[in-house]
């Protein structure tokens, strides 16, 4: 057990353009090697493409996509009597958002479009329409939880 108390969570500052904390978290997830300016250009560029393509507010499309990506259940490995069980558990709201953003950035980078701006815009629009790799990841996680429902009584 730790000798010191719990570490205080740092409050994320809202981004300057949309005044939104989730957008800041997306920027921080996209950022590589501390290049925040580049990450901001990517995210804001993608939001501009989304606004042009869909005609809707980019932030609303982004939130719709996030709701389609964020998992509700996940499995956690638990060792009982020499056997490992995949125990389905509910995901805390903060972890839901973190996983959603992580999956979004991971599957954005894996896409085939030419620039990162296009990749991110297309992945967000796909996720908003319930398609795309990040939504498939969520479905796979939910399938695993559903398949292991029998071990739910081993919950933590």
Curated annotation (Swiss-Prot):
SUPFAM superfamilies with a match to the protein in the record: Ribosomal protein S7
Gene Ontology biological process terms in this record: translation
Keywords from the UniProt entry: Ribonucleoprotein, Ribosomal protein, RNA-binding, rRNA-binding, tRNA-binding
GO molecular function: rRNA binding; structural constituent of ribosome; tRNA binding
Highest taxon, organism lineage: Bacteria
Keyword Transmembrane: no
Any Pfam family the entry gives: Ribosomal_S7
A cellular component term, taken from the record's GO annotations: small ribosomal subunit
Quaternary context: Part of the 30S ribosomal subunit. Contacts proteins S9 and S11.
Family (UniProt): Belongs to the universal ribosomal protein uS7 family.
Protein task: One of the primary rRNA binding proteins, it binds directly to 16S rRNA where it nucleates assembly of the head domain of the 30S subunit. Is located at the subunit interface close to the decoding center, probably blocks exit of the E-site tRNA.
Protein name: Small ribosomal subunit protein uS7
Source organism: Finegoldia magna (strain ATCC 29328 / DSM 20472 / WAL 2508) (Peptostreptococcus magnus)
């Amino acid at each position: 057990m730790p000798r010191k108390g719990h570490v205080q969570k740092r409050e994320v500052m809202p981004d300057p353009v949309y005044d939104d904390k989730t957008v800041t978290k997306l920027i921080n997830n996209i950022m590589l090697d501390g290049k925040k300016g580049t990450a901001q250009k990517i995210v804001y560029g993608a939001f501009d493409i989304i606004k042009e393509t869909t005609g809707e507010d980019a932030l609303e499309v982004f939130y719709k996509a996030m709701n389609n990506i964020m998992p509700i259940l996940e499995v956690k490995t638990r060792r009982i009597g020499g056997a490992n069980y995949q125990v389905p558990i509910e995901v805390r709201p903060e972890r839901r958002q973190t996983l959603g953003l992580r999956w979004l950035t991971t599957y954005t980078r894996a896409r085939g479009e030419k620039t990162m701006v296009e990749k991110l815009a297309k992945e967000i629009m796909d996720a908003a329409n319930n398609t795309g790799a990040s939504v498939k990841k969520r479905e796979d996680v939910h399938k695993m939880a559903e398949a292991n429902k029998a071990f739910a009584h081993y919950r933590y």
